[in-house]
A protein has these predicted regions:
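Short hydrophobic/aromatic patches at helix-to-coil boundaries
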Residues: 105-108
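Short acidic, Pro/Gly- and aromatic-enriched capping/linker segments at domain boundaries
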Residues: 1, 50-78
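Short, surface-exposed, low-complexity cationic segments
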Residues: 13-42, 90-103
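Tight coil/turn sites that cap or link beta-strands
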Residues: 70-73, 78-79, 85-97, 101-102
Length: 108
């Protein structure tokens, strides 16, 4: 398991990836060519992957995402050390916080 700030990145075995993912729409890259895993609401900084890969959002209000890195990749953020990931599949999960009456994603 990898962690960068409020983002968890969990390896997933290829055989455990749901079959619908192959045909699911892929998330677009930002203007800088990155796959954005999470955007900071306060700073505008992003947890993002540079290099080849695909990102698929799973159903639900908070994601999670499935990330495929066929050649491996790096997760970067302006305020955290970069993380190098080996090739493979990953589930990307945003940390959540409980506020009486609701659950929300942690503000980064």
């Amino acid at each position: 398991v990898y962690r960068q700030g409020d983002v968890l990145i969990v390896p997933v075995a290829a055989e455990a990836v749901p079959s619908h993912v192959a045909a699911a729409p892929k998330e677009r890259r930002d203007a800088r060519g990155r796959l954005v895993l999470a955007l900071g609401e306060v700073t505008g900084h992003a947890h993002a992957v540079v290099g080849p890969g695909e990102l698929v959002r799973e159903p639900g209000p908070f994601g999670p995402f499935l990330l495929h890195l066929p050649q491996g990749g790096r997760v970067v953020h302006e305020e955290h050390a970069a993380i190098t990931l080996p090739k493979g599949w990953y589930r990307v999960i945003r940390q959540r916080e409980y506020v009486p009456g609701s659950v929300r994603i942690v503000a980064d």
